[in-house]
Amino acid sequence: MNKIRQRLIESLAYAWWSSVTPLVNREVTPVPRPFCLTFSVTHRCNSRCTMCHLWQYEKSRDLSVEEVQRIFEDNDFSSLTALTLTGGEPTLRGDLVDLLGIITHACPRLHQVTLATNGLESQRVIEQVKSCLREILDNSSIERFVVQVSLDGIGELHDRIRGVRGFHDRVIETLTLLKEMAREEQRLALKISSTVQPANVDSVHELQELAKGLGIPIRFGALVFSPCYYENTLGNGALRFAPEQATRAAAVFSELADADPGANVKFYYRDAARMMLGAQRAQTCMMGYYGFVIEYDGNVYPCVNCEDRTFGNLCKQSFRELWWGAHAQAIRCEMRARCCPVCASICYTLPSNLMQAADIGWRRLLRRVDPGEKKIEY
């Protein structure tokens, strides 16, 4: 019965999303009101990751609470339904809960908040999560508060990738404490995030087993290069897959696609497997049209992986001026042509991959009606 129910739900999702599939791979005009925000609340970070060099560079100060308050007084943010708080390491901001309060007040349709953390300082993370949960308890529109914890290897491997001795054990402690909290708070959900890279491509199965033992879902994403968000495009030879490593990574992503029951992640994994072997991405995501990024200094970007061009700064212009301006539209067109085809990021894949699933499901249905309908290879 559960399998029948699951297939029925997927079929309904396919049918519904097929009506909006054409929006994904072309310019959307007029530009819609966004529903997804990634807010990098600080550039500061307490890890020393080999695949992210953000911690190596001096940055300007973070936005103050007062500046964030002024920014979100703009009612053009009222369409937002999903928020991700990231960094740097977002829990390093002592006023994180104040920022969350400002945003939830300004966004009455917000139903999911995600906190992306490295999990290094267990007690700090737990206290921040508790504070955030208290803040949203009175906000009935928020259905889920997701804590996404990074884990890239077992034991010393994770320590080496993240550049801090004992990092792995602290992450496990953080996950264990969060799991205890989740038993008491239904709106708290947990997720492990892992970046597949040359150093850990042979450790994916171990990570899956660890996550299974913890009872926490894990998602894998391919390593992404960004000149601004990760600042990892220079001197990154060790981060590039050698041909034999790329072949193994492609096999890993193919296996993940076969094993994962979630349609949205399944199609990302298949795309990632092809990209490891040199193909371009088959499906773009919704960033720049339905989602956007606010950086710690107020700069607005269409995507964290296309940060060499900014829409502008919210301390100087209103969101309406930035979002619907000619400058932003030119950047969107450039992003679709230059960045999206080679972007292997798992971030922001839910809407676009459901749309791809919808397209495939819809064509499968057509093939049943018309056997001459061309079979889709994916």
Model-found features: residue ranges?
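Conserved alpha-helical substructure of the radical SAM core
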Residues: 3-145, 227, 354-356, 364, ...
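Soluble, non-transmembrane catalytic domains of enzymes that act on hydrophobic metabolites at membranes
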Residues: 36-60, 67, 75-78, 82-86, ...
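Flexible mid-to-C-terminal extensions adjoining Fe-S/redox cofactors in radical SAM and related proteins
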Residues: 297-378
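Radical SAM enzyme [4Fe-4S]-AdoMet core and its adjacent flexible, acidic
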Residues: 2, 6-7, 140-297, 301, ...
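Short, charged low-complexity linear segments at domain edges
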Residues: 13-34, 266, 270-274, 310-327
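Short, flexible loop/turn elements at secondary-structure junctions
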Residues: 89, 117-119, 151-153, 194-196, ...
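Residue-level signal for well-ordered alpha-helical positions
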Residues: 52-55, 128, 161-164, 306, ...
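Cys/His/Pro-rich metal-binding microdomains
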Residues: 46, 50-53, 286, 341-344
